[in-house]
Amino acid sequence: MPPLDKRIKKFLKDSIRIAPKISGKGELSELRTGLVSQYPQTRKDAIKKTIQQMTLGKDVSSLFPDVLKNIATIDVEQKKLVYLYVMNYAETHPELCILAVNTFITDAQDPNPLIRCMAIRTMSMIRVDKILEYIETPLRRTLHDDNAYVRKTAVICVAKLFQLNKDLCVELGVVEDLVNALDDSNPLVIANATAALIEIHNMDMDAVDLSSLIQSHVSQFLLALNECTEWARIIILGTLSEYSAKDSLEAQDIIDRVTAHLQHVNPAVVLATIKVIVRNLPQIEYSSNSLIMKRLSSAFVSLMSTPPEMQYVALKNIRIILEKYPELLTKELRIFYVKFNDPLYVKLEKIDILVRLVDPSNLKQCTLLLTELKEYAMEYEPEFVSRAIQALSQLGIKYAQESFVSKVLDILLELLERQDTIKDDCCISLCDLLRHCPGNDKMAKQVCAVFNTWSNPEVLLQSDIAKCNYVWLLGQHPNNFSDLESKINIFIENFVQEEALTQMSLLMTIVRLHATLTGSMLQSVLELATQQTHELDVRDMAMMYWRCLSMPNNESLVNDLCQNKLPMISNTLEKFSPEVLEKLLMELGTISSIYFKPDSNRRKGKKYVQNIVKGKHIEELESMAKNEISSKANDDVLLDFDERDDVTNTNAGMLNTLTTLGDLDDLFDFGPSEDATQINTNDTKAVQGLKELKLGGDSNGISSGGKNNPDVSGGNIVSQDLLDLF
C-alpha cells in the first residue's frame, strides 16, 4: 500500500480533476479520441492505456500518428511512454518509425540527457538501412556527449547500426569512435563499449581485432571492475577470461584483482570470476594454488545456497572444474548432500558430484557416502533411485577394495529382492561389480544365486542393456546356473523382438557355450541373426562366426575368439577428452557448460535473425506506413460493434477533423534525404513541425494545461536524480 501522503495527493488530484477519464476497456476509438484531447492529463492517461494494451499483445500500431503527436512535451514521464511505444514497434514496424526520425534528431539535442538517450536508442532500433543517413551526426554527438549516461547508450547503438550496414559504419568511422570509448573515464561506458565490440566481432571477425584490443586495455578493465554495476562486471570479466597472461606475475596480478568478486551476491558474477581464475591458474606457482583453491571452494559452497536453477548451472560447471582439479572440494562433501526439497534435476547432478568428490583413500568418507546413497535408493522417484543405484556401483569400483565392494554388493542384492521396478538398474550395477572383481568367485555365486531364482527374466528385465548384462552373466558363469538351456531358450524364442545389445550378447554367449549346448540352439541363433534381424552389426558378427565354425580348425579358432575375458573395469565415471575439457574450461558459465558441448565455432557463422528493410527510399517507406495504418485503422470493428457511432460523435467535438492519413502528412514534415549533409535542414523542419502541432497548447508545443499537472514540474528533478548516479 502506498504511503499516506501519496494517497492524499492522489485523492486531491482526482477530486479536482476536470479532464475526462479513459475507461478501462481499451477500445481503439476511445484511445484515439483521448490521444488528441485538449486536456494534457487525458492524453497522458490515453498513452498509458495504449501501452497497457500493447503489453497485453494487442496491435495498437494504428494509433501511431496520434501517439507520436504527444512527444512534444516537457513532461519526461509522458515522453518516456511515447518512446516506449515507438521502441516496441521499431523492429516490427520500421517503416512507421522512420517517418518520425526528424523528431528523434531534435530530441537528440535536448538539454535533458535522458531524452537525448531515449532518442538515440530509438533511432538505433529502427531496422531500416536508410536510418544511417540521418543518425550519423546525432550518433557522433552522443558518442562524445558530456554525460556518461548518454555515452554508454550511444556505444551500444554502434553495434546495432553495424548490423544494419557494416560497410557504411566502417566508412563513417563510428567503429573507431567505439574503440576510443574503451579509454573512457566512466566504467559503464567501458563495459558497454566492450560488449558492443564483442558483438561486432561476432558479426564480422575482420571488423575489429578484438584480441589486440583486450591485450592493450587489460589495465583499464581491471581498474573499471570495482566501480561498475554487476552486469557490467560480467562483461568485463568475460573479456578478461579471453586474455592469456604474458607471465606468472601478470597471471597472479589478475587473479588477485578479481578474487574479491568471488563473494559477490550475483551468481553470474561469481561464475565469471571463477572462469578468469581458472584461465590463469595454470600459469602461477604451485605454492600459491592452495590459497586460491580455498577461495574457489568457498565460492562454490556459497553457490549451493542459491535457488535451484542457479544451483543446477553451478553444479554443471563444478563437474567440469572437478575433472581438472579433483581435489578442489574434497572437504566439502556434505554441502552436496541431497535435500528433501531439491528438484529432481538438482538431485541427479548432486549424486554425480558426490561420487566424483569422495576420496578413495578415505574409508570413513566412503562409508558415510555409502550409507547416504543407500537412503537415496529407497526413495520414490524412479530416476533418482536409478541414479543412486548406479552411484553405489561407481562408489564400490572407485574405492577398489574387495571388502568395501562386498558391502556394496550386499546392499544391491538387498534392493534387488525388495522391489521389481529397480531390477534393471541392480542387474547392471551387479554385473559392473563382477567385472571389477573378475576373480572373486564368492561374489559371483552370490549374484548368480539370486538370478537363478528368476523364472521369467525376460519379463522382469525391461531395458536392453539390463538383458544384455544378464545374458553375458549366463555365458561368464554357466556353472552357477541350473537349467541353463531353458534360460537361454527363452531369449532365443524372442530373438527377433529383442534389441541390438541383447541380440549381440545372446549370439556371443551361445557361440561361447556351443560345446555344452545342443547343436540346434547354435543353428537356430545363427539363422535368426543372419536372416531375421535388421541390425547390420549382429548380422555381420553372425556371418563371421558361421564361417569360423565352417573351417577345419573351428574349435580352436572359436575358443580363441570367445574365451578371452573382458578387461577389468577400473572406473565407470564418464570423463572428457583433454581437448574437450580445455574447451569447456574456456566456456564456463555459458550454455556450452550446461550441455557439455563446446561451441568451437561460436564466433564463426553466428546468424542474426532480423527484420531489416533495405533498399527502400523515403517515399516508399512513407507509402508503406500509410497503407499499414490505413489497413489497421478499424481492426477492432468486429469486436466493438458501436465504434462507428462513437467515432462519429467524437469527431463532431474535435477541434481538428484531420483523417489518420492527413495526420501523417501534417505530423511528419519529412522530405527525402540523399546525403547526410542535409541533416541540419531536416532538424529545422522537425522543429517547425513540432511548433505547428495543435494539441491544445501554445506555439512551443507545450500544452497550456501543463501548469495544472503536478508531475510536469518534477520531471527534470527526477531525471537529474537518475543522472547523478553517473
Swiss-Prot record:
Q: What is the membrane topology listed in the Swiss-Prot or TrEMBL record?
A: Peripheral membrane protein
Q: Name one GO cellular component term.
A: cytosol
The record makes one more remark, namely: Present with 2690 molecules/cell in log phase SD medium.
Q: Name one GO biological process term.
A: Golgi to vacuole transport
Q: Its function?
A: Adaptins are components of the adaptor complexes which link clathrin to receptors in coated vesicles. Clathrin-associated protein complexes are believed to interact with the cytoplasmic tails of membrane proteins, leading to their selection and concentration. The AP-1 complex interacts directly with clathrin.
This protein is called what? AP-1 complex subunit beta-1
Please spell out the taxonomic lineage of the organism that makes this protein: Eukaryota, Fungi, Dikarya, Ascomycota, Saccharomycotina
Q: Mainly localized where?
A: membrane
Organism, as annotated: Saccharomyces cerevisiae (strain ATCC 204508 / S288c) (Baker's yeast)
What's in the keyword line of the UniProt record? Cell membrane, Coated pit, Membrane, Protein transport, Transport
Please give the subunit comment from the record. Adaptor protein complex 1 (AP-1) is a heterotetramer composed of two large adaptins (gamma-type subunit APL4 and beta-type subunit APL2), a medium adaptin (mu-type subunit APM1) and a small adaptin (sigma-type subunit APS1). Interacts with CHC1. Interacts with APM2, probably forming an alternative AP-1-like complex.
Q: Which Pfam families match?
A: Adaptin_N
Recorded name of the encoding gene: APL2
* Keyword Protein transport tagged: yes
Q: Where does the record say this protein resides?
A: Cell membrane; Membrane, Coated pit
Superkingdom, natural source: Eukaryota
Q: What GO molecular function annotation could you give as one example from this UniProt entry?
A: clathrin binding
Which InterPro entries does the record cross-reference, listed alphabetically? Answer: AP_beta, AP_complex_bsu_1_2_4, ARM-like, ARM-type_fold, Clathrin/coatomer_adapt-like_N
Indicate the family of this protein. Belongs to the adaptor complexes large subunit family.
